[in-house]
Every structure is written in structure tokens, then in C-alpha cells.
């Protein structure tokens, strides 16, 4: 069965180390790191003339959820071509949101995949 592995925890808790070690052990796997998307987010701050602050109301209102949507969309698409995908991202709000997790599991079920959360 296909799997989406979500390595999640608050920022700066060792997710990247754990994610990379797990990805090496499970190779072949599609590895997606939300930090890679930050380059795009930084540019949005510049274009909007906003100070770069990932805790700001501007970030919360205009960027945060789109980053998560983008990485999940990439992961779901990758499951069309690979049996395993690992996302390295905090997802701290999302894993506590029952409806969000149900929706994600439904999308994965349509792909013949299941969700594995590593906290």
C-alpha cells in the first residue's frame, strides 16, 4: 500500500534530522521539506512590502495555509508515481484538527494510500 509519511513537531525539534534519516532508510521515497518552500514565501513578503516575519498577521493571513496546501498537493501528486512520500513540516495545527486529518485521509484513500504520522 502507498504511504504518505508526515514527520511533524513544533519548529526546531529535530524533524529534519529524523526525516532525512527515515527517508534514507526507506529509499526510494519522495522527500518534501516545507522549508524548501520558504524561498517563495520570502518573495511574497518582498513583493507585498512587508517585513519578513513568519509569526506576523500578514504571514498567517496570506501565506501559511498556502504553504501547507502546496506541500500536500505535491505529496498527493507524487503518489501517482511513487509508493511513498515523506513530508517534513510542522503541521502542528493540522494534526490537532480532526476534520483536516479526515479530509487528508480521504484524499489519500482515493490514491490507494494511507497516512503515517511521526510526532
Model regions and ranges:
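Pre-Walker A (Motif I) flank of P-loop NTPase domains
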Residues: 1-4, 82-83
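Hydrophobic anchor at the beta1->P-loop junction of P-loop NTPases
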Residues: 7
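Glycine-rich phosphate-binding loop used to anchor ATP phosphates in small-molecule kinases
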Residues: 62-111
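ATP-binding Walker
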Residues: 13
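Walker A/P-loop
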Residues: 16
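Conserved substrate/cofactor phosphate-moiety recognition/catalytic segment
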Residues: 20-70, 76
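A glycine- and Lys/Arg-enriched "phosphate-lid" helix/loop adjacent to the NTP-binding pocket
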Residues: 52, 57-58, 108-119
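P-loop (Walker A) phosphate-binding loop of NTP-binding proteins
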Residues: 10
Amino acid at each position: 500500500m502507498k504511504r504518505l509519511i508526515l514527520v511533524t513537531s513544533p519548529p526546531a525539534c529535530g524533524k529534519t534530522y529524523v526525516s532525512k534519516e527515515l527517508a534514507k532508510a526507506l529509499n526510494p521515497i519522495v522527500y518534501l521539506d516545507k522549508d524548501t518552500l520558504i524561498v517563495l514565501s520570502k518573495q511574497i513578503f518582498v513583493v507585498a512590502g512587508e517585513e519578513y516575519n513568519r509569526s506576523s498577521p500578514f504571514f498567517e493571513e496570506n501565506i501559511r495555509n498556502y504553504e501547507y496546501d502546496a506541500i500536500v498537493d505535491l505529496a498527493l501528486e507524487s503518489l501517482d508515481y511513487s509508493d511513498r512520500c515523506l513530508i517534513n513540516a510542522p503541521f502542528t495545527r493540522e494534526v490537532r484538527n480532526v476534520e483536516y486529518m479526515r479530509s487528508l485521509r480521504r484524499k489519500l484513500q482515493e490514491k490507494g494510500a494511507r497516512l503515517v504520522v511521526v510526532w
